[in-house]
A protein has these predicted regions:
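Short N-terminal edge-element motif at the start of the domain
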Residues: 29-63, 94-116
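Surface-exposed ligand/attachment interfaces on beta-rich extracellular proteins
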Residues: 60-68, 107-112, 157-158, 208-224, ...
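Exposed beta-sheet edge/beta-hairpin loop segments within beta-rich domains
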Residues: 71-74, 111-116, 153-163, 259-260
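Extended beta-strand solenoid/passenger and fiber regions
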Residues: 189-248, 254-255, 260-273
Length: 273
């Protein structure tokens, strides 16, 4: 059946991809070489809530009644809240830009610092644990946000199980997180806060960085592409798809671009595994 109507519950995984803050790849995920940059998986995700704010309704009132109503976009911030069953010093340090230090056999992380407000921007992939279409067949629902800033909240010590919360600010971008440029001709919009992806296999995203030499770019060994036809590679700067060949039609692991990527060429691959 067509990928359209579905329902589901729970979270399978949340993956964060820190973004380049300067240079030609500013706003792209921080890949480093021809090996797949997989981002950082958030441990123990429990729930995620999006909030795009309520639309404004403005009535035309005269003679004691409403004659017409105009609905306009919300002026509230687009945000989210991620809750997890684990806390991670490494993840908190990554997001806030502070350092973990070792003192004796202990690790120490500063919190509530003078760097508040300087948290890094990430792309974010959020995947549902179980989704079925309207015929009961298994499928996958994934949200991909190109601009997300996560602020870790301190955990409380009570008789309840630990709950770690991250408050998230979401921003619009002119391209999807994998680099595809949004255009009126193709998407009928030029900016978006997130992409909602429906797929038969598990959707994934990885990044590669060219160096004028590397010609083979690899996927994670534990996450090969189900089929090469499910994989698309994008150049982040041009916003266009990259031509090339895969080493196999099923369980593909290696992509060879038609043209060897230049130094600092940021390639992003989206595929199903």
């Amino acid at each position: 059946m067509a990928l359209d109507i579905y329902w589901g519950l729970d979270i399978y995984r949340v993956v964060l991809f820190p973004l380049f803050e300067s240079g030609v790849n500013k706003g792209g995920i921080q890949a480093v070489d021809e090996a797949a940059f997989e981002g950082y998986e958030v441990p123990g995700p429990v729930s995620f809530e999006f909030s795009f704010g309520n639309p404004r309704t403005i009535p035309n009132v005269s003679q004691g009644r409403v004659n017409d109503t105009i609905i306009l976009p919300s002026t509230e911030a687009k945000t989210g809240v991620l809750r997890c069953s684990y806390d991670s010093q490494t993840l908190n340090a990554l997001l806030t830009g502070v350092n973990i230090v070792t003192r004796g056999l202990s690790t120490v992380l500063p919190e509530g610092t003078d760097r508040e407000g300087l948290e890094i921007q990430c792309a974010m992939l959020l995947q549902q644990l179980v989704s079925h279409d309207d015929d009961g067949a298994e499928m996958w629902s994934t949200e991909v946000c190109p601009r997300a800033t996560l602020v870790p909240q301190p955990i409380n010590k009570t008789d309840a199980a630990l709950s770690k919360a991250y408050n998230i600010a979401l921003g619009q971008a002119t391209r999807y997180a994998w680099g595809e440029t949004l255009t009126l001709g193709t998407h009928n919009c030029t900016r978006a806060v997130k992409a909602h992806v429906l797929s038969n296999g598990r959707f994934n995203m990885v990044g590669w960085l060219g160096d004028c030499v590397a010609s083979n770019f690899t996927l994670p060994t534990d996450k090969p592409a189900l089929t090469s036809s499910s994989a698309t590679v994008w150049n982040f700067v041009t916003g266009a798809a990259v031509s090339g060949t895969w080493n196999a039609t099923t369980s593909a692991t290696t992509f060879t671009p038609t043209v060897v990527p230049d130094a600092t060429d940021l390639l992003t691959c989206i595929y199903e595994w």
